[in-house]
Swiss-Prot record:
Residues spanning the signal sequence: none
Compositionally biased intervals (Low complexity): 90-101, 119-131, 146-155
Keyword tags: Developmental protein, Nucleus
Main location: nucleus
Protein name: Protein LAX PANICLE 2
PANTHER family: RING FINGER PROTEIN
One GO biological process term: regulation of secondary shoot formation
Record localization: Nucleus
The gene coding this protein: LAX2
Ranges for region Disordered: 1-193
């Protein structure tokens, strides 16, 4: 038979080893029975008594603990970079007085106002008020050190005066790292330059160039100058542009003719040169012209003068052929081939438009035929209105 003591403690040597290690590590004492074969009846387990046997041989032969993986270290450093530590509170910061009045009744409004000034939370002020006895009629003074700026007062007061309640604070979501904004360079009032709309940049009036009375030369770029009409002679590249005349005429820009060695002509057309194209009002006026019977015609009988000589065509794209039909109807002729129309001594083709005749033939002085020049009237009004002569074709 197996003794009862052997059933209760099948491994007495393990119990003895536990006693030796517990006595050496924590200084605990145990009572032993000498009459038995090493069975120990230990005391009740104390607060610092080892619950499991310590096997020194197992610790000696265990492999060394592996270091944490590199990914965990990277995550740890990344979290530290994402959440910067709060700046340490130094004693050199300005100290401010935070007064909070606790209580109920008419003191509640002042208490709430001073809570906002001090930057403390409602839970911390409520816990402090309850510790004062719960009376609510006692005024108390709270002193704290914190930065003078109001932006950082809320976080500093919460750290200096934590709540006395045992409830754990709710976990706060991680705040993103604020992006550092560049500090603007301080400017002085003498660094600012007043720039008005339409005003050229400073120094543009110092550019060299021929000056024009009334208009700075720098405000008119060279590539912005518009060319003269094709029937006018071009300016010399070495000569300066002529001065601007002071009088306006239907919002057009007129320039005086360049100085020449010969005296200018008596006509006003030679003294004024039109640079800008005609306005929309002038373009809508159409083409004015005069139909005159030529003094020298190809054969007799000569064609007579029509009663209505001044005509206006609204559309400048009307061709010379339409004028020929008009003369055939007015003069009672049989065929259009009997009539020819000329301008400055040059015979006009039927396909030419009146606008082309005016711009390319009438307005060009070099297009005047020497044989037809004496036949053109010299009246002033004829110099501004296109004159077309008609006659019988030989």
């Amino acid at each position: 038979m197996v003794p009862a003591r052997s059933l209760a403690h099948p491994h007495p040597h393990l119990v003895r080893r536990r006693r030796d290690h517990a006595a050496a590590a924590h200084g605990a004492t145990a009572r032993c029975d000498d009459d038995d074969d090493g069975v120990v009846t230990p005391r009740g387990p104390t607060r610092y008594m080892a619950q499991e046997p310590i096997n020194h041989h197992q610790h000696q032969h265990d492999p060394p603990k592996q270091p944490p993986p590199r990914e965990a270290d990277d995550d740890h450093h990344r979290i530290q970079e994402r959440e910067p530590l709060p700046p340490p509170t130094t004693t050199t910061r300005n100290q401010r007085l935070q007064l909070q009045l606790g209580g109920d009744g008419h003191h509640n409004h002042h208490h709430h106002h001073h809570q906002e000034v001090a930057g403390t939370s409602g839970s911390s002020s409520g816990g402090s008020s309850s510790n004062n006895g719960g009376g609510g009629t006692r005024d108390w003074l709270r002193l704290a050190t914190g930065p003078a700026s109001p932006g950082a007062s809320a976080g500093s007061d919460h750290d200096l005066f934590p709540s006395t309640t045992t409830t754990a604070p709710a976990p706060q979501p991680p705040t993103p790292t604020p992006t550092p904004t560049p500090t603007p360079t301080p400017r002085h009032h003498h660094h600012d330059v007043l720039v008005l709309p339409g005003m050229p940049p400073p120094g543009s009036f110092l550019r060299p160039g021929p000056a024009m009375p009334g208009i700075p030369q720098a405000s008119i770029p060279t590539h912005m100058l518009r060319a003269a009409p094709p029937w006018l002679p071009p300016w010399s590249p070495v000569a300066a542009p002529p001065p601007l005349l002071p009088f306006p005429h239907q919002h057009r820009a007129f320039y005086a003719a360049p100085p020449t060695t010969t005296p200018p002509a008596s006509s006003g057309f030679d003294a004024i040169r039109v640079v800008l194209p005609p306005s929309a009002v002038a373009a809508a006026a159409g083409v004015w012209f005069v139909l005159q019977a030529a003094p020298l015609q190809g054969r007799e009988p000569f064609l007579p003068q029509i009663p209505r000589s001044y005509l206006r065509i609204k559309d400048g794209r009307v061709t010379v052929r339409l004028l020929t039909k008009y003369l055939v109807n007015k003069l009672g002729l049989e065929d259009e081939s009997e009539v020819e129309i000329t301008c400055r001594g040059r015979q006009l083709l039927p396909i030419l438009t009146l606008q082309h005749v005016r711009d390319s033939i009438w307005c060009r002085r070099d297009a005047v035929s020497p044989s037809a020049a004496p036949d053109i009237p010299t009246a002033d009004h004829h110099q501004h209105i296109m004159v077309l002569q008609y006659g019988r074709r030989p």
